[in-house]
Amino acid sequence: ESLKDETVNICKKYSASVILRKKLNLQRKGYALDEAVKEILSKKQKYDAYFIFDADNVLDKNYIKNMIPIFDKGYDLASGYRNCKNGNKSVVAAASALTFSLVNTVFNNKKNKETRNITFSGTGFYIRGYLIEKWKGYPFHTLTEDYELSSYATLNNLTTYYNTKSIFYDEQPLRFKDTINQRIR
């Protein structure tokens, strides 16, 4: 995405697999996820779940360990608790962090208690492998593909869960211009 982005070099340093986008004319996260998932599916390996994270996310050391009991209960999709890495760096970052906190802590906690479907917000969640295989990719491509996924889950009676014990840290944009670019890239 950026000349300063060291993600690929960091991945190579740790011998992680890297999937480089080919269809750069299709902008937005949903298209990037679709391309990556199709590449993974083409290798004909089966996975129990696909975890969706942004490159700048940092997982708590117990994130996966704390997500396993939720997976074992049979939930189709589950989101972890998003904490902010840089909420004190600017007003825009603070507002963004508060928005995610409101959606997750207030709304998703309440939905969990009422056994209603949660609202996914971009990153830090898993999707069961059978769904990815059924979809043959990641079919959510709107500007708010995470809300599209949330709506799909509700309309198709998929089970969702908000897991406050699976913590991850996300970096928020510092300038308003960056929030706009983040949505349309």
Go through the PLM ranges and name each one:
Residues 5-6, 53-70:
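Acidic donor-binding/catalytic loop of UDP-sugar-dependent glycosyltransferases
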Residues 164-179:
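Active-site donor/metal-binding and catalytic loop motifs
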Residues 13-15, 156:
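Short, structured coil segments at secondary-structure junctions
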Residues 1-8, 23-25, 58:
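A conserved acidic beta->alpha catalytic loop
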Residues 115, 141, 150-168:
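Catalytic donor-sugar/metal-binding loop of nucleotide-sugar-dependent glycosyltransferases
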Residues 47, 55-57, 145:
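Short acidic donor-binding/metal-coordinating loop in glycosyltransferase active sites
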Residues 50:
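Short aromatic/hydrophobic "clamp" motif used to bind/position activated sugar donors
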Residues 20-43, 62-142, 180, 184:
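Long helical/loop segments within the catalytic core of UDP-sugar-dependent glycosyltransferases
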